[in-house]
Every structure is written in structure tokens, then in C-alpha cells.
Amino acid sequence: YKIESQLKKAQERRVWLDSGGTLVIDPCEAMTVIDVNTAKFTGKRALEDTVLRLNLEACGEIARQVRLRNLSGIIIIDMIDMKTPEHRQMVLDALEEAFASDRVKTVIHGLTSLGLVEMTRKRSRPPLREMLAKQEETHE
């Protein structure tokens, strides 16, 4: 099943989206920061539509990665800048929907004045990276 490669992939900092965009996930002591980047993604439509599509795609993958890595506490998401309030609301709604099935209490607090998404997720167990580090220590 290639479990080792899947576990290694789940710890990588950069996650590629199907569209060619990326998520960069940086857990630190105080919070986790997730940065959404365009990378290779270039839409054929207007820039604003391209940004919206990439941010919407990122919402689903962010929810998947947060659950997979069991991230908790304060999570800040730096979406690609959106000009229109309608697009910002669509992305917040998509993020709410992506976390709706999460069994761990997750609250999307909204956007800051800098356009960062603030969210919190209750800690239910240690993050994946912590569990794997402890497992490595016991095998040494």
C-alpha cells in the first residue's frame, strides 16, 4: 500500500493542487500558517476568476490536509488576494462547507483586514508529525 510514502507525503511542506497551484503548510509553536499560491496555475479567464477558482479548489484540499495532519489550534490561511466581497464570501462559504463534516470542532472566524482567514480547530489528539516523531524515538 506504500504507507511509508503516503506518511512522508503527509508531512511535506508543499502540497500541489490539481490545477497546478500549491499550499504551503507551516506549523509552528503558536499557530499553523497555510499559504495558497498560484505556482503553475494559469486560468484562461480573467485574473479575478482564476484567483477565485484556485482559492475554491484550495478550500477542499486545506480541509483534507488539516484532518490528515490533525492540525489544531489557531490556523491562519493566506488565500490569494480577492478584490470583490462576493468572491471573498464565496471562499469563506466553501471553507465552511469543506469543514462541515469534520468531527473535530472547527470554527471559521472570517477574514482579517489583511485578507487572512482566521480559524480554530479543537485539539483532539497530537498532530501527525508529533505522533510520527514519537514513534521514531521509540524505534531508536
Stretch-by-stretch model annotation:
Residues 1-23:
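A contiguous, basic/glycine-rich beta-loop/short-helix subdomain that forms a polymer-engagement track
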